[in-house]
C-alpha cells in the first residue's frame, strides 16, 4: 500500500485523516502520510487510461482549447510548495455536531506540486475573455448510479486574478499525482 496505515485514521473510504503524531516529521509531508478527502469515488487507472492523453478543456479565454497532459507539459512547468488543508479540518472540536468526517487536526499537509502555471495555459489560449470574472475548476468525477449530480458536484471558484499564481499540477512530491489526490491533473491555487 502507498499509505502508512499507522499514520492514518480512516473515517470512510473517501475520508482518511493523518494522526497528529505523523504531522511535522519533515518540512514536506510524505505522500504516505497525506490525508485523503474526496466527495466522489476515486477514478481507477483503467478509467483514466494513458495519463499523457488525459484531456483538460480551458474555457473563458479568447481561444478555448483542449489540451492533453502531454501538451500541457510542453508549455513549461514549475514546482511550488503549498499548504493543502481540508476546509473541514478541526470540525471534530466543534461544540455542536456537524455533518461530515469529524476531523481533528490531521486534514493538513505541506506539499510540493509540479505542473504548468495557469498563466502559460491562458497565454496559449490568447488571454482571458474580457467577460470572465472567476476561475473555476471542476473534475470529471463519475457519479455513482442514482446520485443527483446537482447535489454532489463540487466546484471551486476564485477571483480571476488568482490564475497568475495557480497551476495545473501533475506531480505531488516528485511523483505522478495519485488518483486519490486528484490525479492525473488538478488545479492548485
Specify the residue positions occupied by each region the protein language model found.
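Structured, non-membrane catalytic/scaffold regions adjacent to prosthetic-group chemistry
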Residues: 1-189
Amino acid at each position: 500500500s502507498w499509505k502508512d496505515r499507522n499514520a492514518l485514521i480512516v473515517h470512510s473510504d473517501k475520508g482518511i485523516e493523518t494522526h497528529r503524531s505523523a504531522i511535522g516529521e519533515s518540512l514536506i509531508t510524505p505522500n504516505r502520510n497525506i490525508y485523503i478527502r474526496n466527495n466522489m469515488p476515486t477514478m481507477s487507472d483503467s478509467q483514466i487510461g494513458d495519463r499523457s492523453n488525459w484531456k483538460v478543456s480551458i474555457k473563458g479565454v479568447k481561444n478555448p482549447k483542449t489540451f492533453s497532459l502531454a501538451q500541457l507539459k510542453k508549455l513549461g512547468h514549475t514546482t511550488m510548495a503549498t499548504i493543502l488543508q481540508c476546509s473541514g479540518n478541526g470540525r471534530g472540536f466543534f461544540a455542536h455536531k456537524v455533518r461530515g468526517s469529524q476531523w481533528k487536526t490531521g486534514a493538513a499537509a505541506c506539499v510540493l506540486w509540479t505542473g504548468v502555471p495557469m498563466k502559460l495555459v491562458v497565454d496559449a489560449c490568447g488571454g482571458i475573455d474580457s467577460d470572465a470574472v472567476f476561475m473555476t475548476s471542476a473534475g470529471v468525477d463519475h457519479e455513482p448510479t442514482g446520485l443527483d449530480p446537482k447535489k454532489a458536484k463540487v466546484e471551486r471558484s476564485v477571483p480571476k486574478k488568482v490564475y497568475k499564481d495557480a497551476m495545473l499540477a501533475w506531480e505531488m512530491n516528485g511523483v505522478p499525482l495519485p488518483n486519490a489526490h486528484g490525479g492525473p491533473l488538478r488545479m492548485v491555487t
